[in-house]
Amino acid sequence: MKRIFLFLITNLAVMVVLSATMRILGVDRFLTAQGLNLTGLLIFSAVIGFTGAIISLLMSKPMAKWSTGARVIDPNAPANQREAWLLDTVHQLADRAGIGRPEVAIYQGEPNAFATGAFRNDSLVAVSTGLLDSMTEEEVAAVLGHEVAHVANGDMVTLTLIQGVVNTFVVFLARVVGYFVDRAILKNERGVGLGYYATVIVCEIVFGILASIIVAWFSRQREYRADAGSAHLMGSREPMIRALARLGGLEPGELPKSFEASGISGKNGISAMFASHPPIQARIAALQHARLG
């Protein structure tokens, strides 16, 4: 709740600053004289910006299960020893992290895992068969610790709120620019014309791309923190380092020589700005130098 409150206050503060800046520069007076209500537009933009993000968060668990075909393990009747071990491991990690025990699921796919859910005490941790088949139990436990750390850190809520903030500004700025082009450049004086709608569409695309870079940057910072969280829950950084090395195709114990290789959702060059995960080598290097407490 504190995290949500702080982000909402931050969003409100930024909106107020933006509104005040426009008033000082005279943009507010010009647009208002032309029939545009900035206060109303800010409220409209916030509603649009946050509604989609919050709905996505609330639907994240069922959507994740549906999209991956994940099968939730019955905590009272695991089908085999591996499922029993998974349940026990996730529950132990959750207890150490001080959160409610998540649902645990398995899905068919390449080595990967994820955590989702709107609440710390009502989340889902899922792991792929590919990851279970390619890692040792200690490495799998480290990956599970990484996902539990995401839940404990409130990363799903944090990124949802960040997405809501940037969505708000994408919607708001696109319409301000569209109104300016329509009235000041195209000299349309009756309602809004095609120039307004065309400009809004183009601006939403451009601003949306820029906004995704911001969200991706925040996501990468949360990945570093979740790696450190796994090391803390495991009592050692080595299991997570070995798990990352295996995910990146490195030999266990091999030290990275550069930061050029891709991460789990590997990207290079300009596309790296849009990646939700840092490069594997960067994560290993950060974990090796992280202060664990």
Swiss-Prot record:
Residues the entry annotates as binding Zn(2+): H146, H150, E223
Topology within the bilayer: Multi-pass membrane protein
Main location class: membrane
GO biological process: proteolysis
Record Pfam families: Peptidase_M48
Gene: htpX
GO cellular component annotations of the record: plasma membrane
Lineage: Bacteria, Pseudomonadati, Pseudomonadota, Betaproteobacteria, Burkholderiales
EC number(s) reported in the record: 3.4.24.-
Name of protein: Protease HtpX homolog
Alphabetized NCBIfam families for the sequence: PRK05457.1
Molecular function GO labels: metalloendopeptidase activity; zinc ion binding
Subcellular location per the Swiss-Prot or TrEMBL entry: Cell inner membrane
